[in-house]
Amino acid sequence: MLGFLRSPKFWNDGNSVVVKVLDPVSRLYSFVSNVRLNSVTPVKADVPVVCIGNVVLGGAGKTPTVELVCNLLREKYKSPQILTAGYGGYLKNVVRVDTNLHSYLQVGDEALLSANVAPTWVGRNRVNSAKAAVACGADVLIMDDGFQNNSIEKDLKILVIDSRQVFGNEHLFPAGPLRELPESGIAKSDLALIIGEKNEALESRIKAMKSTIPIFRAKMEITDSVPVENNRVVGFCGLGYPLKFKQTLVECGYEVLDFVSFADHHPYTITEIQKLSNGAKSVNATLVTTMKDFVKIPAVFRNDVSVVKIKLVPENEDFKKALLEKL
């Protein structure tokens, strides 16, 4: 239901009339979510489980965090494998993602990206996914977007927060972007990873909620620069927090002549990409997007779009040290 939701403006405005109207619905959403979570008894997996999650609907940076954690765990484990629900895809039963066989329509865009990092399992039933992964040699599991899923017992829970987005207007869905209250998410977290610029107010707030939680910082960096004439680009993406991609382009020195945002997990049409391509050509700019968006572009137009590859880079070695010590 939430797969193709575009973040409304009032999600950043706590005083909006719309927020006040939707607050009763938010309370109902919270009640139903809590009942669902508390009605499940977590199952202990046969290998350690690292859970990556957030308290907002998209945009915090879970997918690049999954890649980072997976790569760091390889220093201690032979076969880290990833569990994801496959949001945006129609396959519901457990399946190992094959990038040569599956499309984003089947397994979702994020699962296709994860499958390039490590064996990735899609399935609504995370317990069955975990069993399948272990049967195929997994010695540690990374559970993507697992904070609101109690089906598996977690050995380490990492809360991901974007330093600009933070918690939006601080209201629960649908009045705001929160899936659960920040206090709840922080209370059950073992580590907090803040992505973006330093935000001392946010760090102080986290410590006030849970004084013992270690806080780490990381930044998004472009790994492969796109050959761009005169540094002129037109960017587009369908992310939970699209402004993050635009800001990354600006910070890396590109002149962003135009930027178009779509709903998270948006499936692109030929008409949309043709319009974007024509717009970029009209201003003598290169059309750029993220890898997550590129996998959903109709094949006939992929030569017209350049991919800006981005990875998450920790501020220092402390995050890796804490990660490996806790498992």
Task: Pin down the residues of each PLM region.
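A transmembrane-helix-recognition feature enriched in membrane-embedded lipid enzymes
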Residues: 1-48
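Residue-level signal for inorganic ion chemistry
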Residues: 28, 63, 114, 144, ...
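Walker A (P-loop) phosphate-binding motif
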Residues: 37-100
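Phosphate/Mg2+-binding loops and adjacent switch elements
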Residues: 87-210
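G-domain G4 guanine-recognition motif of GTPases
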Residues: 191-200, 218-224, 236-241, 262-268, ...
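Redox- and metal-dependent alpha/beta enzyme cores, enriched for Fe-S-associated oxidoreductases
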Residues: 222, 226-270, 324
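Short, flexible loop segments at boundaries between secondary-structure elements
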Residues: 263-264, 304-327
